[in-house]
């Protein structure tokens, strides 16, 4: 769990308004609670901050063009190559130094084959684009079972998406009335949708991957009518317990003859450390070992392959 120095509600608002840097936001929904209300929150928060981002909407399921989108692409009758070319034509070049941020909304990633999903996302990704894509958890990934010579050890589509995503938003329904989770699950398995689902008030779990390599996880109740976000009490208790478990000067006294404690300045510097994994696993390239040489490092001057400068 994240440290208590972060405000979870502010973090959620920054992600929804695209103020927080997160190139790929993955929304996981279901029949019980779709991502429609959450997408509306992205649009509302971005406008409330005074940011009128151009929105490119890629439709696999949506029939009518949403009023808020700038460009609408009907992807149902397009092949992979032409779809990527048309999307890129609406986005600024990745090498552009000054370009307005764009939002790309994909209403369903389930229609893209597992074989092409990583290539599709990597070709769209750029420093000037934030992708907000939905994946339906209720639909099983059947493509991987019919691809010839498919490696059984290769991960499924959902695992790939969760690995690539910089932010994961798992949406869940808030049940009202006499319905319980087990009853709703049984009805949905029989394709019987009870009343009281897809409410304006829903629950979501936020997983935000930081540049330092760790993840922040929070549970919220979202009211899409009032645009209010409430941190769940269970998450608050975990935050308090984790903060109680942090080191204090009193806990470390008498253990050694030297100081084991860290000052607030040192803790802040620790939180701002960025490990090289994000640079090594960026879009469009394979893994790499990233190391920055310093002048004091020892290296062999006669080795032609070891020239750090």
Curated annotation (Swiss-Prot):
Protein name according to UniProt: Elongator complex protein 5
GO MF annotation terms: identical protein binding
Keywords on record: Cytoplasm, Nucleus, Phosphoprotein, tRNA processing
Job description of the protein: Component of the elongator complex which is required for multiple tRNA modifications, including mcm5U (5-methoxycarbonylmethyl uridine), mcm5s2U (5-methoxycarbonylmethyl-2-thiouridine), and ncm5U (5-carbamoylmethyl uridine). The elongator complex catalyzes formation of carboxymethyluridine in the wobble base at position 34 in tRNAs. It functions as a gamma-toxin target (TOT); disruption of the complex confers resistance to Kluyveromyces lactis toxin zymocin (pGKL1 killer toxin). May also be involved in sensitivity to Pichia inositovora toxin.
Gene Ontology CC entries for this record: cytoplasm; cytosol; elongator holoenzyme complex; nucleoplasm; nucleus; peroxisome
Chief site of localization: cytoplasm
Subunit structure: Component of the elongator complex, which consists of ELP1/IKI3, ELP2, ELP3, ELP4, ELP5/IKI1 and ELP6. The elongator complex is composed of two copies of the Elp123 subcomplex (composed of ELP1/IKI3, ELP2 and ELP3) and two copies of the Elp456 subcomplex (composed of ELP4, ELP5/IKI1 and ELP6). The Elp123 subcomplex forms a two-lobed scaffold, which binds the Elp456 subcomplex asymmetrically. In each lobe, ELP2 is tightly sandwiched between ELP1/IKI3 and ELP3. The Elp123 subcomplex binds tRNA through ELP1/IKI3 and ELP3 and can bind 2 tRNAs simultaneously.
Matches recorded under Pfam families: Elong_Iki1 (PF10483)
Subcellular location: Cytoplasm; Nucleus
Other comment: Present with 3870 molecules/cell in log phase SD medium.
Residues carrying Phosphoserine: 3-4
UniProt similarity note: Belongs to the ELP5 family.
Superkingdom in the source lineage: Eukaryota
Annotated pathway: tRNA modification; 5-methoxycarbonylmethyl-2-thiouridine-tRNA biosynthesis
